[in-house]
Swiss-Prot record:
Name of the protein: Enolase
Catalysed conversion reaction: (2R)-2-phosphoglycerate = phosphoenolpyruvate + H2O
Residues the record marks as active site: E205 (proton donor), K338 (proton acceptor)
Protein family (similarity comment): Belongs to the enolase family.
Length: 426
């Protein structure tokens, strides 16, 4: 029986220069694997708790030595000797060890690091790629990338309210061709922005962070870039938004669009989205309303839910019980999947199974604070997620995921790129 022989954690750096955890697991056959935990900038209030040191003398309070110590002591002590390939049992032991619903004791960053490293070590010991170990024989589908090519909100220091303006290359036969087309649009957009004397510095996720005067100008610029790059707007490459509305809302559920000097209530904001969807080929809107504005979400879902994908991120925080509430209320039709929002790989799988059972699309996602770790690329293929958000085709921590997906596509001898079929199954 393959068992856990040793576990340890190290404080390393993420793509924003903040500390994070690298957890390593060694198995009884001396197989070793590691995983680096990501971290978000805009976070949902119901996310699992990321444990930070709050010691202002180190990393401005953002150190993770306490979380590392939890791995190196409590977690290590209780997990050594357990069967490695029984991921669900080990993850349940981690949950019980913490004893809180949001990992407030051990830290979700400590727990997830170990959970990820264990999956990777077990796959390695069995001589299986991670996607095959997690997904079995049915892991064949390459996801449609949602490439964030203009950044705003908390991901960039500019006047754009919406956090992410994305492109989705739907009209292609392979992931490789879809990624190539997206990269050409990205570089074409840079030239267009240069020509308008706009900034082409990049945000946390590799997208450009220009100072447009309102939230529509990025849609115009991206549409121009798609056509100038030689692709059919809406047919080959569509648009998507992550509004991150929880960052814009006040206590009365009024939404402050500072870039446009507007304050809108839920119904007015939904009307604004309807105007945008009518004018531009927007196929997906994420976090269109605040995580607490459930009445607004119900209205948004009623007005646009049959027309486009409505993704809950802060709304659901990868939590099966919260998703169940959304299903019962007919809220949204898709969920963003971020393992560090919930804590372990097994809990993430539970949420995905629930979503798929109720025909909610699943979008595998990175965080704004990332690393060279490409776990989510394998995870997306393992689960036939259909979509992945992992930034632009810039910054090496984003490219690591795309390169891994290219590698997987090659291993699968092409696999299945869902492309145009994505929303036909929704």
């Amino acid at each position: 029986m393959l068992t856990i022989k040793d576990i340890h954690a190290l404080e390393v750096m993420d793509s924003r220069g903040n500390p994070t955890i690298q957890a390593s697991v060694i198995l009884s056959d001396n197989t070793k694997a590691s995983a680096i935990v990501p971290s978000g900038a805009s976070t949902g209030k119901r996310e699992a708790l990321e444990l930070r040191d709050n010691d202002k003398t180190r990393f401005l309070g953002k150190g993770v030595l306490r979380a590392c110590e939890n791995v190196n002591s409590v977690i290590k002590h209780h997990l050594i000797g357990l069967e490695a390939i029984n991921q669900a049992f080990v993850d349940e032991r981690l949950r019980a060890l913490d004893g809180t619903p949001n990992y407030a004791n051990l830290g979700a960053n400590a727990v997830l690091g170990v959970s990820m490293a264990l999956a990777r070590a077990s796959a390695k010991a069995l001589n299986l790629p991670l996607y095959r170990y997690l997904g079995g024989a049915n892991a064949l589908t390459l996801p449609v990338p949602m490439l964030n090519i203009i950044n705003g909100g908390t991901h960039a220091n500019n006047s754009i309210d919406f956090q992410e303006y994305m492109i989705m290359p739907l009209g292609f036969e392979s992931f490789r061709e879809a990624l190539r087309a997206s990269t050409e649009v990205y570089h074409t957009l840079k030239k267009l922005l240069d020509g308008k004397n706009q900034l082409t510095s990049v945000g946390d996720e590799g997208g450009f962070a220009p100072n447009f005067s309102n939230n529509v100008e990025p849609l115009e610029a991206i549409s121009q870039a798609i056509e100038k790059a030689g692709y059919k707007l809406g047919e080959e490459i569509a648009l998507a938004l992550d509004v991150a509305s929880s960052e814009l809302v006040d206590e009365n559920f009024n939404y402050h669009l500072k870039g446009e000097n507007k304050i809108l209530d839920s119904h007015e904001l939904v009307a604004y989205y309807k105007e945008l969807v009518a004018k531009y080929p927007i196929v997906s809107i994420e976090d269109g309303l605040s995580e607490d504005d459930w009445e607004g979400w119900a209205f948004l879902s009623k007005e646009l839910g049959r027309q486009i994908q409505l993704v809950g991120d802060d709304l659901f925080v990868t939590n099966a019980s919260i998703l169940q509430k959304g299903i019962e209320k007919n809220i949204a039709n898709a969920i963003l999947i971020k393992p560090n929002q919930i804590g372990t790989i097994s809990e993430t799988l539970e949420t995905i199974r629930l979503a798929k059972h109720h025909a909610y699309q699943c979008v595998m996602s990175h965080r704004s604070g990332e690393s060279e770790d490409s776990f989510i690329a394998d995870f997306a293929v393992a689960l036939n997620a259909g979509e992945i958000k992992t930034g632009s085709t810039a910054r090496s921590e984003r490219i690591a995921k795309y390169n891994r997906l290219l590698e997987i596509e090659h291993e699968l001898k092409g696999g299945i790129y869902i492309g145009k079929e994505l929303f036909k199954h929704g």
